[in-house]
Amino acid sequence: MSSDVRVHTWPCSYYLDLEKQWLPGKLTLTPRSLKFSVDKAEEVLVGLPLSSITEIRKETSLFIFSAITVLEKGQAKHWFSSLRPSRNVVFNIIEHFWRELLLSQPGTAANPTSPMTRGQELMGLMASSQRRMEDTAKVLHHQGEQLDSVMRGLEKMESDLDVADRLLTELETPSWWPFSAKFWKTPVEAKPRDSVSVAPCEPFGKEGVVIRVPAVVSQRTESHSKPGKLTVLVSGLEIHDSSSLLLHRFEKEDVDDIKVHSPYEVSIRQRFIGKPDVAYRLISAKMPEVIPILEVQFSKKIELLEDALVLRSRGRASPAEGGCSIRHAASRLMGCTTHQELPTGGQEGQQSQLQKDWPLLSEGEAQELTQILSKLKGLALDTEAELERQDAALDGITVAVDRATLTVDKHNRRMRKLL
C-alpha cells in the first residue's frame, strides 16, 4: 500500500516557534507520516515521519486551549491546537497509526537505514498470499457448513412430508376399512434418493474468527470515536472497545451495506424501519488486510468510494501479467528488468554466471520459502476439494428442493379433495 495515501485530514492550527504565532491550516495523516500545510500557501510546512516520533501527548496551551504535542527525535516539539472535530478524535487516530507502525517494524528504531533483502521481500509476498488463501479457505468452509445445514433441513422436511403423507392416507381411508390403523405401525419403505453424502466441516476456532484488528471506532458522529477492535467472523462482524467489551455484533445477513471510504477507513450499516440505523465507522492501519476478506463475504453489499478505488486499481492486471504475476514479482525482486533477455547462444553458461554474480536467497530463506509454497499447495488442493464437494452438495440440494416441491403440490391437491 502506498505511503502517500491520505488516511485523514483535520483543520487545525500549528504553533510556529520562529515567529511566535499560530498558523491555521490542515493536519494530514498518511500511513507513515504526519504533515501540516498552511491554508493560504497550501504547501507542506511541517512533515514528520511517524517512525521519528518518540511521544504523542495531550496538553493545553496557556492552561486553557487543548492541544496535541508531538515530540520528535532530537527533542523537537510540535504543537497542534484548534483541532476539529475534537482533540480526542485526532489523538486516537494518530496514536493508533503511530503504535501500529512501531509494532509492525520492531527493528526500525535500531537500524532505520537497513533495507530489506530480496529474499525477505519475496518471503513477505508469499506470506501475504498464504494469509489471503487461509482467510478465503475459512470463508469457503463456513459456506460449506451453511450448505450442510440446508441439506439437513431439507432431509427433515422430507421426513415431515412422509408423516403428512401417512396422515392424508389415513384421512382418505373409509371409516369402515378395518386396516386403517396399520398405516401408523407399518415402517415406511425407504425411497430411493439421489442424496449426496455431506461430510461435516469443523469450525475454525472457537467462534470462527477470520481476522481481528485494532481500530478506532466511532458511532454516528466522529466526535465520539475511541480505540477498539474489529473482528471478522465467518458468521458476521463484531466491534469491541479497548476493554474487549462487545459494542455491537452484525450478523452476516443483517449487514445492509459496507462503504470503503479509503484503504484505511470503512463504515458498516444495518437499516431498521421505524428506528435509527445502526452504523459504525472504523479506521485501522490493518484495514487493507481486512477489506479483501469483506469483499469475499459481502461481495454484493460492499462499495468502494472514490478515495478507495486505489484498491481496485491495484487488483487489476492484464491477462499476461495475471498469468505470471509471481514470476514477474520474483524477477523484479531479483533486480531484473522486464526487457532483459538472454541471447540464444551460451544461454546456460550465462545463467550459471548470473547465479554466481547475484546471490538471491540464503539457505534459511530458501527453506522457509519451500515451506510456504508447500502450505500454499496444500491449501489450494483443500480449496479445490471443498469447491467440488460444495458443487455436488448444490446438485443434491437442487434435486431435494424439486422433489419437496412436487410432494407439497401433491399433498395440497389431496387436501383440497378432502375439503
UniProtKB/Swiss-Prot annotation:
Q: What GO molecular functions are on record for this protein?
A: SNAP receptor activity; syntaxin binding
- UniProt keywords, alphabetically: Coiled coil, Cytoplasm, Membrane, Repeat
Cellular compartments annotated? Endomembrane system; Cytoplasm, Perinuclear region
**GO (cellular component) term, any one:** postsynaptic density
- What residue stretches are annotated with the t-SNARE coiled-coil homology domain? 109-171, 356-418
Q: Name one GO biological process term.
A: exocytic insertion of neurotransmitter receptor to postsynaptic membrane
Presence of the UniProt keyword Coiled coil in the record = yes
Its subunit composition reads:
Associates with the BLOC-1 complex. Interacts with BLOC1S6. Forms a complex containing SNAP47, VAMP2 and STX1A.
* Biological function: May play a role in intracellular membrane fusion.
Which protein, by its recorded name, is this?
Answer: Synaptosomal-associated protein 47
